[in-house]
UniProtKB/Swiss-Prot annotation:
The keyword Transmembrane applies. This is Capsid protein G8P. GO terms for cellular component: helical viral capsid; host cell membrane; membrane. Keywords: Capsid protein, Helical capsid protein, Host membrane, Membrane, Transmembrane, Transmembrane helix, Virion. It comes from Xanthomonas phage phiLf.
Length: 42
């Protein structure tokens, strides 16, 4: 993990973590929404 973060500033690392969390949340919400829509129309 340390090797990956070598040469990366704290701000860049924080931005990457926030972006990753946002993507994970978006994917999770999309899957949940798809199930709701499928059950509604099903």
């Amino acid at each position: 993990m340390g090797d990956i973060l070598t040469g990366v500033s704290g701000a860049e690392a924080a931005t990457a973590m926030i972006a990753a969390a946002a993507i994970i949340a978006l994917v999770g919400f999309t899957k949940w929404g798809a199930k709701k829509v499928a059950s509604f129309f099903g």
